């Protein structure tokens, strides 16, 4: 795990590229459909699956618009469909990871984003797709996703008043035939039987064979495949990610690009917090956010040194800041956002980190505990 340097003296630093605000494409009158269903306006334009079958990218965006120093133009869609993620105007991109994802969209590369929890791996792919107006479907490969879920199955349906057996496509053949960016979340938690179904489509022009249908599906030219994972397929030596599995290295070899997205620089993390929690976008609020990020860095360094068994992710820091804005109490928000999840024996250490950064003793700290005993 890479860390920022500090007085603790037991971590290496990791630099992140500069943060960038990405201009969104004009979307005309059509907006992405809300989660509750499809709006009439979207349905009238291009929201149905059948219309997606013929949809192709019809414009391009320069990679430099994403803050990436590369001479690359990325295919994009001029209009949105219901499958396009919502744009987060406050999102900050990591240049290296963004470049890898853009290459996946532009050159049909299979891209895996690996990193620790809460670093924004899935959101990174979603926000690039959102700005390209590229339809995206996200599948969480938990232990209950089966081969039938992905490939499909025979189902009994009513036709002309009669019960007949009909094959219902799973999500994989449905997506392969359309201009969909398919994102497999928690890729290293997938069951082996499911992973081998995915293996064939990992090749750039890999055709999907449906044995039950005696049918071979040719991928849509704009079909793209991405994945996120906490590990690199060699198991979990940290003990943080129970449920992950070693991955077949023959399958890992089929991923064209593997990029790492781990913890960010302190300045980058503070910028993300300011964008996510506008209430702290003041001089005093900035000082509070700086202290929050320092606490998070100390937990990461403590993990590397073996003092802690858990770390504070960027997602947790955002949650802490949001809860602090809700309750108006930074210490209480810290307790309910992170401290209560720590091992009882490790809470005094975490409370000490908090005291170093905020100059305030928590009830869990060693000093406060000793004072109460006296």
Residue spans of the language-model regions?
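AAA+ P-loop NTPase catalytic core and its hallmark functional loops
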Residues: 45-286, 294
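Residue-level detector of structural "landmarks"
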Residues: 11-13, 32
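Short hydrophobic transmembrane-like helices used for membrane targeting/insertion
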Residues: 1, 22-25, 30, 38
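Low-complexity, intrinsically disordered or signal/transmembrane-proximal segments
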Residues: 2-4, 14
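Long, low-complexity intrinsically disordered regions enriched in Ser/Thr, Asp/Glu, Pro/Gly
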Residues: 31, 42-43
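Serine residues within intrinsically disordered or low-complexity segments
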Residues: 5-6, 20, 45
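Alpha-helical lid/collar subdomain of P-loop NTPases
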Residues: 45-81, 98, 265-266, 270, ...
